[in-house]
Structures are given as C-alpha cells and as structure tokens.
Amino acid sequence: MMNANRIPIRILGLDPGLRRTGWGVVSVEGSRMSHVAHGVIVPDEKGEFASRLLCLFEGICAVIDAHRPDEAAVEEVFLNTNAQSTLKLGHARAAALIAPARAGLLVAEYSTRLVKKAVVGTGAADKAQIGFMIARLLPTAGKTTADCADALAVAITHANLRIANRRVA
C-alpha cells in the first residue's frame, strides 16, 4: 500500500548531471502507480559553467510548473575517481535540490545503490536492468533513455519508501 489515503500524489524524480539531467514524474494513488511524463534537460556543453547550471535550474523549474508534482526525489552523488568531476556533479545536484525546494516541495535524497535495490532488487544492477524494470513497472512510459529511466527509478523508490518511512516515524 503506497498511498494509504488514496489521494493521488505526483512525484518528480531527478537524476542530476551537468551534461544531461533526467527527470520523470509518476502519479501514485493507493497501490497504483502510473507514468505521467519524463524527459532530459541538456545544457549547451560549450556554455559557461554558471550558464549550464542556470539551464538545469530553469529546466527543472519548468518541469515543476508543467507537471505540478507534490514531492521530489533526487539521486545522491556517487564518488568519482576524478575529484573535479565529483565537485561539478555536486553543483548540478544543488540545482536539482534547490528548484523543487524553492517550489515548496518536500525533497528526498536516495543513494544510487538504494534506488537500484528498490527497483531491480540488487544494488549492483546495471543500466539495462533498470530500463527493463521501468518498462515493466511503467509500461506507458515507452522507451526511455538511461537518464530518464534512472529519474523514474528515483521517483518509484520515493513512492515506495515514503509510506514505509512514515510508518516508522
């Protein structure tokens, strides 16, 4: 039982990246989950760093305005061997956290490993396995890119864990 009150809610999942930020929106009513929309925000790779972050922020704000989610969930940063890349990814995550917070949404964060375990059943799942499970869980989503599948997986994880977390609290 995902939504005990049976009041439909929309959840925005975000897979932040400086080159491509995937987003996905799901609707949850009771134990039923359905696909609303998904896409990718792609800043100009040749643009200045600050302009690329602004593009991500404004793109996420536009998604929020268009799809009116009630809550948001963002994938946490994984550590890279390149510290500079990890730092830049952290900036992209900041944009992904601030945009929904600015809109007044509850924002949750989940590790990549937890998202994989929640959707596929193992924290070591690869991109193909995530894509396969997204197609099974949200058949109306159609074919998704890896970024979109990851974002939808984050939204699904939040949908499943939000009720469990409330039961514990």
Curated annotation (Swiss-Prot):
Coiled coil ranges: none
Cofactor note text: Binds 2 Mg(2+) ion per subunit.
Record's keyword terms, sorted: Cytoplasm, DNA damage, DNA recombination, DNA repair, DNA-binding, Endonuclease, Hydrolase, Magnesium, Metal-binding, Nuclease
Binding residues annotated for Mg(2+) 2, in chain numbering: E75
Gene3D superfamilies associated with the record: Ribonuclease H-like superfamily/Ribonuclease H
CDD domains: RuvC
GO molecular function, one term: DNA binding
Residues holding Mg(2+) 1: D15, D147
Taxonomy, superkingdom: Bacteria
Stored PROSITE patterns: RUVC
Main location, first listed in the record: cytoplasm
EC assignment: 3.1.21.10
Reaction(s) catalysed by this chain's protein: Endonucleolytic cleavage at a junction such as a reciprocal single-stranded crossover between two homologous DNA duplexes (Holliday junction)
InterPro entries the UniProt entry points to: RNaseH-like_sf (IPR012337), RNaseH_sf (IPR036397), X-over_junc_endoDNase_Mg_BS (IPR020563), X-over_junc_endoDNase_RuvC (IPR002176)
Signal peptide: none
NCBIfam families: ruvC
Family: Belongs to the RuvC family.
Protein name as it appears in the record: Crossover junction endodeoxyribonuclease RuvC
Organism of origin: Caulobacter sp. (strain K31)
